[in-house]
Amino acid sequence: MRETLTAAITAVIESAMADGRVRLEAVPQVSVERPRDPSHGDWATNIALVAAKPAGMAPRDLAAIVAAGLVERLGADAEAVEIAGPGFINIRLARGVLADVVGRVRSERERYGAGPRTGRRVQVEFVSANPVGPMHVGHGRWAALGDSIARILAHAGDEVQREFYVNDAGVQMDIFAASVSARYLELTGRPFEFPEDGYRGAYITDIAREILDAEGERWADATAADREAHFKEQAYAAVLGHLKRVLHGMGVDFDVWFSERTLHAPGDAGAATAIERGIDRLRSAGHVFEREGALWFRSTGFGDDKDRVLTKADGTYTYFAADVAYHADKYDRGFDLVIDIWGADHHGYVKRMESAVAALGHPGKLEVIIGQMVNLFRNGEVVRMSKRTGEMVTFEDLLDEVGADAARYFFLRRSTDQPLDFDIGLAKQRSSDNPVFYVQYAHARICSILRKAAGAETTDESVDVDAVAARITADPAALALLGAEPGTLAGDAELGLLRKLAEFPEVVSVAARQRTPHKITSYAEDLAAAFHQFYTHCQVVVDDAQLRNARLALADASRIVLAGALGLLGVTAPQRM
């Protein structure tokens, strides 16, 4: 409808320009938005305010021309076109247009709100936790965020790949191996020296014990170098497997697990490594120089505040050099847009990476989202330690306590650029105070209504709700009964629910464009509220067959859209609660 109204407004102004009523060189960009106050109508535009000055007209005079033209063009589709304030134009759609959304939803089903195929290939890289220990709750937030953004972009028409960058090269892996080695020696009763900056979590001892149980004490008498080289691979595999299991338990599965080691590995027949090739690309484009024995990237040429080291004076590569190579590889794989989701501690890294991508020939094709941290609360108190382990609360601890649905939903309720206060007690409540329960309960309630309408017991597990819904037929004459009594509680509740269903495609479009899954959670809660209002004021199963079918169809459309919204968040839509 936004596109229809935009085209209509443009055509009205062009017609007025052609006959001399409006003097403009070109039609300004037309903006059509949902009013914040539903009483102002279904859509609004400020085009008269935008175009009045270049047209040399008073805004309300121009608004009058546009409004009159819209009334003529929209005809019976518009209930009212009104001028408000200094020159805003509010548009209220006819009930028939609103009621049409029910048929559209029930026809398109899970494709409702989906965009056309864009042909754009998008990679979303997220979580990318070091494989040296369990994930913290911040990783959980970024997992929910990245996966939901991927789902929303795919629904909007993009081809999306999810990728996890495994930081399995570098000194942290050596420290990790030395830590496991020390705990292994401790378990065998041998003398050991724990690394000063080693990893001290109980999970290190757990990994060492797994190795001891599987392979015995044969590594106790090996050289430290041999033991640590072996343990590095064993411990790495154990942690990586654990990360995959925890993420899968939250419904997050990656298409690619990209190993940093591959960037350091030489190519076939001793060919250059990916890092060397990445640096060579920058060098051939004239963006590399030497200073003080080191090799530098001239990132100041792309807006960075200082140049960045690629190769240190001792010949070793910086982490930045590996990141340059990694991003070069991403674009070599044909992605049109790369979205990286990083923790707040990487904020200062953004500009240098954007500079490198531009220097590689892909300006504007990298988008970095900074995910803020999560603060856990229980009974109003900050939670820092796990009751089970006495150590930091991990992402897995939280999942075990509140479940995947609640964790995902709560992680996504707030804008990414804001720290998140996660109330554990609230996430576990089975009441309307818990937003995810509130939304899921609305879906389950609709399923119960549909089962009851089919004459089945609401607890009958054998009833296929989709099959029941498919037998509900509501022709245009029946749907025209919805909202037929505006100004009454029932009529207003029906209209409110219809309007909310009609908003979903635009909500998805905005969430995809802005990378804002929290707009989907807000919408889901509003839709659930609109349905609960409808259910309170409208008896669904009534004697009048036409009205009954119309209201059942409206309930079914609400079920479909609630499930669709929850699906974009990676949250289940239960049929019973």
Briefly describe each language-model feature range:
Residues M1-A99, R106-E110, A114-M577:
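Non-catalytic interaction-recognition regions
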